[in-house]
Amino acid sequence: MRLGTLLCQLVLASATTSAKWIVPGARWRATDGSLVNAHAGGVTRDAGTGKFFWFGEYKVQGQEEGGGVSVYSSSDLVTWEPHGLALEPIEGHPHISNEDIIQRPKVVYSEATRQYHMWWHADNRTYGELLQGLAVSDNITGPYTYVDATAPLGNWSQDFGMFVDQKDGRAYAQYSNGDRREGRDVYLTSFNENITALDEVVHRFDKYDLEAPNIVQTDKSYFALMSHKTGYRPNNVVAFRADSLSGPWSQPFIIAPLNTRTFNSQSGFNLRINGTKKTTYIYMGDQWDSNSLWESRYIWLPMEINEEEKSLELVWHDVYDLNVETGEITPIEGTTYYNMEATTTGKAYHQEATFASDKTIVTGIYGNDSKATFHNVEGSGKPQWVSFYYQNTDDMGFGDQPGGTPDRINGTWQLRRISSVIVNNKTEELQTLYQRDTHKGIILSSPLMLNLDKGSHNTITIGGLYNGHDYKGADIDRIVVYPPEE
């Protein structure tokens, strides 16, 4: 590794470990500089300390499943301290070995047992068991001791969610019951008072064939969020609404702008923050990378709920500040540079695009020969977030149906392009920019933390890197440069 690259990584790591803002889709780092590794999990707020504890699937290259459950703590939902594995795999164990499925863990405190209870989707690698696992601990960070893995009320259970009603403290499980023809439902089932077993089905979302369920509770309504079954490909997450958990529930409706595929994320959990000035609801989704699951990111966004309209919508911000005490959200303003201001090389060029921000888009970016360069970019001399707005239509054709096929007959899924990003021609500090697929005419953004020199003489050059298929970079609409986190 070159010294310049090492120095760049150290600067970026130090910047992100002292983060102040939430940046959806970025590489989030813990206080030790490592990437936060807590996929498809949930956040539990400890009543005694007020701290947030984030549990999730631990994934590394070569061990995408069965890695155990990691846990992090934070007082602000931004700065995350790692505490290792709350639930460690045990070699040869029938349900929590490295060969097993340990997915979508959730943790609640049981007043009856005075212990923390962790529940998850427990399975084998063929998804032939479809069970719910339980482990307990005296401490919220663990270690958790395995108790059992059971079939809920004799049924199947796949994607698992958990919800505690703020009105009476009752805990509920939400779970899809598999892909068999006899399944394809989502169940909402109450726990017993000890939170050691399920006792009664409250509602069944019959034959909608959805997964990744979780519930948002307002003072007047319940919203049940669920994902279509498209594997690790994103889709249009939907919500149902009801006045009571037992229903009647509304027809499902899409919660994000159509064809954004929920900003390339899957529902998994949500958090209600009862602030001193307002109540805020945060959608906590996973942005999966099926080519390298350990590189999957997190999409946390505020939800805008209108009780009169009975609606719930995700609100996109590249960068925002969340005050967990007051509940207030403040979008961070940046400086926009449009693609018409960029120069191109090789076969990259500006093309008319009526859907783009200035009616053009840079396309044809490929490898190191066909690139786009933004000039006169203002920098602070400190690490700054930069959002790259792009279009990538490699696999735009897949929808919300299970299975599906790539755009190309007999083709293979591509699902993302990878661009190279170089600041001020410093090739030794090249950054990789992952750009998930979009529908045609849909512009999404992907963030990077970059080191820009102080002043307005900076250049940002975008090329293409190998993504497993070719060296294409996504089409570029604009970039937005944000101030440093101070």
Residue ranges and their predicted role:
Residues 221-222, 235, 266, 276-282, ...:
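A short pocket-lining beta-strand/turn micro-motif at the edge of beta-sheets
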Residues 323-486:
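Extracytoplasmic
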Residues 17-210, 217-221, 226-261, 278, ...:
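Beta-rich carbohydrate-recognition and catalytic domains
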Residues 1-19:
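Fungal secretory targeting signals
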Residues 161, 263-273:
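Short aromatic loop motif centered on NTY/YTY
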Residues 273, 284-288, 465:
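Short, loop-centered acidic/histidine patches that primarily coordinate divalent metals
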